[in-house]
UniProtKB/Swiss-Prot annotation:
UniProt KW Oxidoreductase keyword: yes
Residue ranges constituting the Fe2OG dioxygenase domain according to the UniProt record: 80-174
Cofactor binding note from Swiss-Prot or TrEMBL: Binds 1 Fe(2+) ion per subunit.
Residues involved in Fe cation binding: 98, 100, 155
Single GO term (MF): 2-oxoglutarate-dependent dioxygenase activity
Top-tier EC class: oxidoreductase
NCBIfam families: PRK05467.1-3 (NF003974), PRK05467.1-4 (NF003975)
Cross-referenced PANTHER family: PKHD-TYPE HYDROXYLASE YBIX
Name recorded for this polypeptide: PKHD-type hydroxylase PMT_0286
The organism of origin for this protein: Prochlorococcus marinus (strain MIT 9313)
Amino acid sequence: MEPLTHPLLDEATVSQLRATLLADETSWQDGRKTAGYQAAEVKNNLQLDRNSKTAKENSQLVIKQLESDPLVKSFALPRHIHGVMFSRSGIGQGYGMHVDNAYMSSGRSDLSFTLFLNEPESYEGGALCIQTLQDSKQVKLPAGQVIIYPSTSLHAVETVTAGERLVCVGWIQSYISSNEDRTILFGLNAGARALLAEHGRSPELDLIFQAYTNLLRRLGS
């Protein structure tokens, strides 16, 4: 399954969110506290205490945006968005190659997401590297854009060499646990919606939407 990159937050919302996070100087802590035993060995960043007021309020903002975005809903089929946290990495910090835990206290991880909160030119290094079968995909998106990718992927964050990287990360438990099945459903839904927009409703299109809905019902968990 190919990752989805998509604008999620507008400029004003990102600016306000960034200012709020950085103003809370007392709630940032060692990121290894939230890592699994294997990932903790390669994790070197700061994360906002999930129990802080700042984290709780702004996590809900991000979750609501993800839950209400039509493309995200079609791509991820989210049942539960969980584990949302805010992370910052300064010079010399990063996160070595690892895979996310399959199950967390907050839910199953089918898809992982990273929402970028500052512009790529404001820091050097810090790219999200997602390992594929043949190579590695490096990602640094504009502020407000999100990447959603399978949690089964090995991935890392390059060491920051200048400036500071600020992101929001989290996980999605999907109604469809299989990446392959989710890809098929996404393509079927996208094609049906495009036909609806171009030609309007028809008995034939009703059959396609019926097939999509019943496949979702059959494959879903």
